[in-house]
Amino acid sequence: MAGHSKWANTKHRKAAQDAKRGKIFTKIIRELVTAARLGGGDPGSNPRLRAAIDKALSNNMTRDTLNRAIARGVGGDEDANMETIIYEGYGPGGTAVMVECLSDNRNRTVAEVRHAFSKCGGNLGTDGSVAYLFSKKGVISFEAGDEDTIMEAALEAGAEDVVTYDDGAIDVYTAWEEMGAVRDALEAAGLKADNAEVSMIPSTKADMDAETAPKLLRLIDMLEDCDDVQEVYHNGEISDEVAATL
């Protein structure tokens, strides 16, 4: 929300949704398998796999579990028909929404995604309708830390930008392919991040009011509940004042 990192917002919103943890792990494993199948099992030469590993570790997945997933992908398995599909649409209040899916059945997936949009006052758009509003970036997040120290180390490691929020949280932005290398450099400097993920960063924000904010959150929850949906990105901005009413 305003003055807070996207990761902090998501973390606090999901804190009461521990029942979804198993589903989150399932989605991460699916991404690990697919990334390894498409680009090989070496994260050093497979940025998509490295990003998936970083996400797995940020969600406290064990090395044994993620290594088994990578081995499945390299060896080929029942997930061989999985493909990445991106859906674009508009949510409440004109919010731009991108939905990243991994699916073996396009018809099933698009039906579920379309249903979520229609139930929450939005509509599914055509390819390219909102994608131009987003840029794919690596985001390395710190709940707190010394801004100058993190900024100096991050920029020296090749980061593109460092943003500090009102609550003291810090986000380091990188080219998505370079996120793993920048995170390694930060850790080598003694700066351990709380989260690292590849995200779609919006170039503009859509302010949500007391009426549209709960509808947007419901849309996000409905989309995330779809088994085929891996990630949901949007440009909705919820102020602290509006958040306090939710």
Swiss-Prot record:
Keyword Cytoplasm: yes
Subcellular location as annotated: Cytoplasm
Matching InterPro entries: Integrase-like_N (IPR017856), TACO1_YebC-like_2nd/3rd_dom (IPR048300), TACO1_YebC_N (IPR049083), Transcrip_reg_TACO1-like (IPR002876), Transcrip_reg_TACO1-like_dom3 (IPR026564), YebC-like (IPR029072)
Keyword match NADP: no
Keywords associated with the record: Cytoplasm, DNA-binding, Transcription, Transcription regulation
Gene Ontology biological process terms, A to Z: regulation of DNA-templated transcription
Family note: Belongs to the TACO1 family.
PANTHER family named among the record's database cross-references: TRANSCRIPTIONAL REGULATORY PROTEIN YEBC-RELATED (PTHR12532:SF6), TRANSLATIONAL ACTIVATOR OF CYTOCHROME C OXIDASE 1 (PTHR12532)
Protein's recorded name: Probable transcriptional regulatory protein ESA_01378
Organism for this UniProt entry: Cronobacter sakazakii (strain ATCC BAA-894)
